[in-house]
Amino acid sequence: MFLIITRDTMFFTAMKNILSKGNVVHIQNEEEIDVMLHQNAFVIIDTLMNNVFHSNFLTQIERLKPVHVIIFSPFNIKRCLGKVPVTFVPRTITIIDFVALINGSYCSVPEANVSLSRKQHQVLSCIANQMTTEDILEKLKISLKTFYCHKHNIMMILNLKRINELVRHQHIDYLV
């Protein structure tokens, strides 16, 4: 069984056609996940305009104990699903490489441009969603010094001179 988590109906249709050999289920919100029915599924997540990280959605996915998770994202997030095997791929992956990845064969999938820790991605998502510093500190339960440290590291990784340049960053749509 394949669970396709996306808000993009064109993406789902493409995945359904590629994965025609199996049972393909479209998931748009966390209420549609059935922990018993979808146990040990193969999960494919599209994060474009659908940032499921750091939410109950990801917790639900972890409870499914998926066989493998493929995440379409320009970010590589370290240990985002604990011990569940995760592969990050760009949306520009070829169909041949994607099918090889699904079948467990070797494919030359390019690595994500940006590699972040879970906390860095969480801070970055909060900043992209225009949360105030105080709200971020309260939500993530971190100190101001830790926040500034994460913010500095994120700016270095994304090659930003000022944090307000983030709104024009090429991957901003994957954070909201």
From Swiss-Prot:
Q: Write the protein's name.
A: HTH-type transcriptional regulator DctR
Q: Which parts of this chain does the entry mark as a DNA-binding region?
A: 133-152
Keyword field contains Protein biosynthesis:
no
What GO molecular functions are on record for this protein? Answer: DNA binding
Query: What is its induction behaviour?
Result: By acidic conditions. Could be induced by EvgA via the induction of YdeO.
Described function: May act as a transcriptional regulator of dctA. Could be involved in the regulation of the genes coding for the type III secretion system in enterohaemorragic strains.
Q: Which CDD domains match?
A: LuxR_C_like
BP terms from Gene Ontology: regulation of DNA-templated transcription
Q: Which UniProt keywords are present, listed alphabetically?
A: DNA-binding, Transcription, Transcription regulation
Gene3D superfamilies in alphabetical order: Winged helix-like DNA-binding domain superfamily/Winged helix DNA-binding domain
Q: Which SMART domains match?
A: HTH_LUXR (SM00421)
- Domain (HTH luxR-type): residue spans on this chain: 109-174
Q: Per its UniProt record, what InterPro entries does this chain match?
A: Sig_transdc_resp-reg_C-effctor (IPR016032), Tscrpt_reg_LuxR_C (IPR000792), WH-like_DNA-bd_sf (IPR036388)
